[in-house]
Amino acid sequence: MHGREAIEAHYRVAGARMAGLPVYNPALTVELLGWRAVEGVGALGVLITPWCMNLFWQPPADAELPASGERAVLSLPSGDYECTLHEDERLGRHASASLCSPMQDFPGQAEARAMAGEVLRLILAVPEAGPEPSRSGLLSRRALFRRALGGAS
């Protein structure tokens, strides 16, 4: 598992190239929030950048997954999340799922961190005991944000 600092440094370099684009929000900085190992999954966190917010997933090295550019499903107790796989010389194999882009609706880092924290809380939540939830479909980005913002799921 790569460390949070290495991942953030990689995206800071990318940020230098993005700085002049209209999608870039200069009130934000690169931060990987909640980066942690999750048993059976690998490691994950929410990556905040001035141009996007992504779920960032690093699967275990021995995971059998499709090629870079293809989609893979990250299965957590809270649901299944479709991610795009990437292969990078510095970061190795990792995947991302777009949560928000562009980031102009966030006036500052505190608001972006609050949203990222709520997303982490929701995706890492273990459902309460009861009937087995339906896993018939992937949780859409819209449904995840509706839950994060306190709406019905």
UniProtKB/Swiss-Prot annotation:
Gene3D superfamilies: [NiFe]-hydrogenase assembly chaperone, HybE (3.30.1460.40). Pfam families: NiFe-hyd_HybE (PF11939). Belongs to the HupJ family. This is Hydrogenase expression/formation protein HoxT. It comes from Azotobacter vinelandii. The gene is hoxT.
